[in-house]
Each structure stands twice: as C-alpha cells, then as structure tokens.
Amino acid sequence: MCDARMYTSQIEALKDIAECQVGYIGGVDNTANIARQVRDQAPENFALVGLSMGGIVAMEIVRQAPERVTRRALMDTNPKAEIDEVKAARQPQIEAAQAGQLEQLLREVMVLRYFTSHQPHLNWMICVLIWH
C-alpha cells in the first residue's frame, strides 16, 4: 500500500534535479532497526522525507545520524509513542494481511478510513494506490 509506488509521480518530477530513493522498511522488528536499515541504504549525505510511519523512521534516522541528514520534511507524523488502543487495533489487521486477507482488509477498513465525500479527487488517488 504505502511503498515506493506511492511516490512514483514525485520521483519522476524530481528526477532531473535529485536522485530519489525510497527506503525499504520491511524485515526488521523496531523503529531503531528500520532507521538503521534505511540509513545504510542511503548515500553519505541526504535529504529526508517521511510520511506517517516514514516520518517516525525519519526522526529516528536524525537521532542516530544527524550529521548525514542535510534537510528533512516530515508529513502527517508525530514523535509520540503509539498508544495501546492503536496497537490493539493494528494486530488484527496484521493477522488478516498475513492470512491472505489483505484485499478484504483494504475494502472493509482502509477504504472507510480514507475515503471522503468532501474531497472526491482524493478518492480517485486512493483507488489507484490500492488497486495497482
């Protein structure tokens, strides 16, 4: 869902002025290790953009190696620890995705959470992200 495909348009628009990379955040079990993994994939010095969970990872990268980050943009994120209610709600979603029910999860949970009648252009963008 929120992987490199989400940033295709931005990467294309910036290709003449910047080398853009989307860090891989899978395969590790905590924010510090995710940040280390992304940092290890990055050039020696780099600008950093983080959206939501990516912003949390970006803040950890800055904590670990501030001298490597030339500038940063953090969007729709916060520095606070996840509250227990959010953690509890996420676990059934993780289990559903692992059980091969990702499409059902997207239809029943994510679409309802992110679709809006007030901004129909966002609905189209979300559909493109979900179904491609």
List the predicted regions and their residue ranges.
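Short, well-ordered coil/turn elements that cap or connect secondary structure elements
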Residues: 15-17, 43, 67
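Alpha-helical elements of Rossmann-like donor-binding domains used by nucleotide-donor carbohydrate transfer enzymes
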Residues: 6-9, 13, 33-37, 41, ...
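Conserved HGGG/HGGXW glycine-rich cap/lid loop of the alpha/beta-hydrolase fold
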Residues: 1-32, 36-37, 47
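Short, glycine/serine-rich, charged loops/turns that create anion-binding
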Residues: 1-2, 79, 119
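Conserved hydrolase catalytic core segment
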Residues: 45-86
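Conserved alpha/beta-hydrolase catalytic His-Asp/Glu region
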Residues: 82-88, 100-132
